[in-house]
Curated annotation (Swiss-Prot):
Localization (cell): Cytoplasm
Protein name: Gamma-glutamyl phosphate reductase
Gene: proA
Protein family: Belongs to the gamma-glutamyl phosphate reductase family.
Reactions catalysed according to its record: L-glutamate 5-semialdehyde + phosphate + NADP(+) = L-glutamyl 5-phosphate + NADPH + H(+)
Entries under InterPro entries matching the protein: Ald_DH/histidinol_DH (IPR016161), Ald_DH_C (IPR016163), Ald_DH_N (IPR016162), Aldehyde_DH_dom (IPR015590), G-glutamylP_reductase_CS (IPR020593), Glu-5-SA_DH (IPR012134), GPR_dom (IPR000965)
Pfam families recorded: Aldedh
Pathway annotation: Amino-acid biosynthesis; L-proline biosynthesis; L-glutamate 5-semialdehyde from L-glutamate: step 2/2
GO CC annotations on file: cytoplasm
Chief location of this protein within or outside the cell: cytoplasm
Keywords, ordered alphabetically: Amino-acid biosynthesis, Cytoplasm, NADP, Oxidoreductase, Proline biosynthesis
Length: 449
């Protein structure tokens, strides 16, 4: 007999089959209803979040919750505005499902279509951030995927209220199957979800390194995501130092509690004496704790800086998610690239240089899902990449990589349109040859005639 959790997941799986065939206009109508519902229920959301924040502060004071998680938990009116605009941005995006990717004529009257289609049922397990619910639900809905959500206990009230507001809006929209979106709330349900590989097609974990690694290590379901966000900026000998100051400051300080914030600053030794003093001053003004290798420590020590320490080997492997930064001097761009590929997490890394040859070298050799040239690592984000929003950032090398929007929530199927055709015609002693000619026709035009 199925458990309550399995029953909910089965219901979502059945709904995913129906949702895959819902037309774009119906999905867009549902998304607009979701946006309006969030706007109309602001006070309810803020009240629920206030209760979560009070409990989170207590847990932080007891050492059970980090400041980074508390920061991610907070919902404000501007954040609700962001949720609403994010949903409406998804409405503007092209429906990724049902698109003809390629068309190939195998023979006259025998045409093969490669067509995008929803993955099916997505499981989203996340910590702290309540804005994950509208963000991911909108992307999954538009791409035709049903979704099972499991949020962290620290955001229980916020997640529940936001989820219920959105689901009620969907239930009032004709054409959207009921049960396509489910919310799980207890800690025990995580292990149950991880075991349901019979129904769930893809898992997307959003949270700390340990959290994501736990998910990856305890399920047979395919996992889209990244465990670490150890991002670097390398300041080259040919850098415009004014650009370097701005990019390095923004990459660390603009919002340090996220996975695309810089954790290690690499500086070419030739320019360190000129560059580092001003950079240290800017960081110290906002309270960034700095951890230096031997070479950079010697320079910082001359400045009389108080908030400095020597870096250890562990610092190069650490995602701080805080106002902490490790700094290292390197002798060449090759050494910088080697350090990034050894200690980085293949997430986002940047170079500051005006040299075209070094720019090309860095782009080609840094093995990361996003590579920035003279720009902040903080740009590695689905919204900023024009995806409307993102379901997560993937450092995988198959299916989807980097900030993953709706294009990462579809796969494809092959559809062959024939007229009683047989393989026997194209086999044997006198086989008929295939034409294998590319065509411009779209499957949607054919089946909607």
């Amino acid at each position: 007999m199925a458990t309550d959790i399995e029953q909910k997941v089965m219901e979502a799986k059945m709904a995913s089959i129906v949702l895959a065939s819902v037309d774009t206009q119906t999905k867009d109508n549902a998304l607009e209803a979701m946006a309006k519902a969030l706007d109309a229920n602001r006070n309810k959301i803020l009240e629920a979040n206030k209760a979560d924040l009070e409990e989170a502060e207590r847990m932080k004071n007891e050492g059970k919750l980090s400041q980074a998680l508390v920061d991610r938990l907070k919902v404000t009116d501007p954040k609700i505005d962001g949720m609403i605009s994010g949903i409406r941005d998804v409405i503007k995006l092209e429906d990724p499902s049902g698109r003809t990717i390629n068309t190939l004529e195998l023979d006259k009257g025998l045409e093969l279509y490669q067509v995008s289609s929803p993955i099916g049922l997505i499981g989203v397990i996340f910590e702290s951030r309540p804005d994950v619910v509208p963000q991911v639900m909108s992307l999954c809905l538009k791409s035709g995927n049903a979704t099972v959500f499991k949020g962290g206990s620290e955001a229980l009230n916020s997640n529940r209220v936001i989820f219920n507001i959105l689901v009620e809006a969907l239930e009032d929209t004709p054409g959207i199957p009921k049960g396509a979106f489910q919310l799980m709330e207890t800690r025990e349900e995580v292990m149950d979800i991880l075991a349901l590989d019979e129904y769930i097609d893809l898992l997307i974990p959003r949270g700390s390194n340990d959290f994501v690694k736990f998910i990856q290590d305890n399920t047979k379901i395919s996992v889209l995501g990244h465990a670490d966000g150890i991002c670097h900026v390398y300041v080259d000998t040919n850098a415009d130092l004014n650009k370097a100051y701005d990019v390095c400051f923004d990459s660390k300080v603009q919002y340090p509690a996220v996975c695309n914030a810089m954790e290690t600053l690499l500086i070419n030794r030739e320019i360190a004496e000129e560059f580092l003093p001003e950079m240290v001053r800017r960081y110290e003004e906002v309270g960034v704790e700095l951890r230096f290798d031997e070479g950079s420590y010697a320079i910082a020590e001359k400045l009389g800086s108080a908030n400095i320490a020597k870096a250890t080997e562990d610092d190069w492997k650490t995602e701080y998610n805080d106002f902490i930064l490790s700094i290292k001097l390197v002798d060449s761009i090759e050494e910088a690239i080697d350090h990034i590929n050894k200690y980085g997490s293949h997430h986002t890394d940047a170079i500051i240089t005006e040299n075209k040859t070094k720019r090309k070298q860095f782009i080609a050799l840094v093995d990361s899902s996003s590579v920035m040239v003279n720009a902040s690592t903080r740009f590695a984000d689905g919204f900023r990449y024009g995806k409307g929003a993102e379901v997560g950032i993937s450092t995988n090398k198959i299916h989807a990589r980097g900030p993953v929007g709706m294009e990462g929530l579809v796969i494809y199927k092959y559809v062959l349109l024939g007229n009683g055709d047989k393989v026997a015609t194209y086999a044997g002693d006198t086989p008929r040859p295939f034409t294998h000619k590319e065509l411009d026709s779209k499957l949607s035009d054919i089946i909607n005639e």
